[in-house]
Amino acid sequence: MNHNKINALYILSSTNTFGGASKAITSLLSGLMAKGVSPTVVLPGKDGLYEELAKIGATVYYAPIRPNVYPKCKGLKNIILYIPRLLYWHALNAYSRKRIAGYIKDKHIDIIHTNVSIMDIGHDIAKRFGIPHIFHIREYADKDFNIKYFPCKEAYHRMFTSSGNYSICITKDIRKHHKLESTPSSRVIYDGVCPIGSVKTNNAKERYFLYAGRIQPGKGLLPLVKAYTEYVSKSGGPNPIPLYVAGETTDAAYCQNIRQHIAAHGINDHIKFLGPRTDVASLMQHALAIIIPSEFEGFGFCMTEAMFNGCLVVGHNTGGTKEQFDNGVELSGKEIGLRYDTEGQLTDHLCKIAGSQQQVFQETIATAADVVSRLYSVEVSVNNVYNYYIEILNNENN
C-alpha cells in the first residue's frame, strides 16, 4: 500500500477539551495529517473536542460509546443504578458497534487507534474487518482512577497482546503495570505537549501557587490543601502566598470535603477556586510554582506543559510524575523540579519557595524546559507514532 496516505479510524472516550488525553490527541492528529494520514474520528458527543477536531479538518462522527468498565458502586444511588447502568452501557456499545461499522465499511480504513485502554469497541471492529488495532494506554486504570475493566483486567491484558493488536503506552511505568514490557507489539511513546521552540520564559512571577487539573480524588487536591494548610500555619505569616485552583469539578462530594477542610481551618481567603480555564498556560507562566499532587499520574501532561511554560514544578514522586523527574536526571544530570513523597515534604517545599528569591530556582526551570523540549515535543511524538503506523502496516502486509 501507499504509506503516504493512511486512512486511520480513531475511537475517543470523551469530548472534554481540558484533559491531557484530549490535548494530546488534537496535536497528534494535526501532525499526522501533515504527514498524509487521513483521520476519521468517532466521539461520544457532538460538543467540545468534536467541534475542535472538525475545525482542523478531521472527519468526525458521533456514536454513544461508553467505556467497557464496571459502573461506580459507591453510595446508595450508584448501588441502585449499578445493574441498569451496566446493561445500558452494553446496549449503547452494541448499537455503537453497528453504527461505526456502517461509517467505515466503504472507507478502506488501514488502522484503528483507540485513544484509551478502557474501550474495546475499536478492538472488536478491527477484528471484524481484519484491520490492525492500537490501544493507546494512557492510564493505570485501577491505581489512578479506581477503574475496573469489564469483565476483568486479565481479559483486557489478553486483548492487548492478541493477534492484530498493538499498544502505545505513554510511560514506561504504565507499560510495566500492564505487563507489556516484553511484548514486541508494544511501544512507549510519550505524549507531545508543545511544539519545538515554544518554551516561554517569564522571570516576572506573581505571588501564587497553582494547581491545574480536575477536582477528583486521584488528582490529589485534598492532600495538597492539607499540606498548604500546614504551610500557612508554619510560615505563612499574616499574608501567605495564595493557592489558585484551576480546573473542573468532576466529583462534587470530594470537592465538598475539600471546602469543608478549608473552612474548618480558616483559610478560605487564601485558596481561590478559578473553575475551568482556557488561560492555563498564562497562569503557569506567572505562578511561583505549580504543584502536581496526583496519587498516580499517568503521563503528567500538565507537569510537562508547565515546564514548557517556564514554571517550577513541585511533584508527587510517583507514577508518570516520577518517571519525568527521573528522565530529567538521566538526560541532564540534574533535578528538573522539586519531588516529594509525603505531605510534610510538600509543606517544606512550599515554605522553601515562599522564603526564597525567584532566582534560586531559575536554573532548575531552565533545565526542565530544555529536557521537555527534547523529550516531549509534538514533533517527536508525531514522528514516533507515524513510524509505528508504518511498522505495523508493513508487518501486517508481510
Please provide the spans of the model-predicted regions:
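Carbohydrate-associated surface elements
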Residues: 173, 192
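A conserved mid-protein helix/loop that constitutes part of the nucleotide-sugar donor-binding site
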Residues: 19-27, 207, 214-233, 253-256
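Glycosyltransferase donor-sugar binding loop
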Residues: 42-48, 193, 212, 242-256, ...
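Short hydrophobic beta-strand element within catalytic cores of glycosyltransferases
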Residues: 312-315, 319-322, 326
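Nucleotide-activated donor-binding/catalytic signature segment of Leloir-type glycosyltransferases, i.e.
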Residues: 255-275
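A short, well-ordered alpha-helix in the C-terminal region of glycosyltransferases
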Residues: 360-375, 387
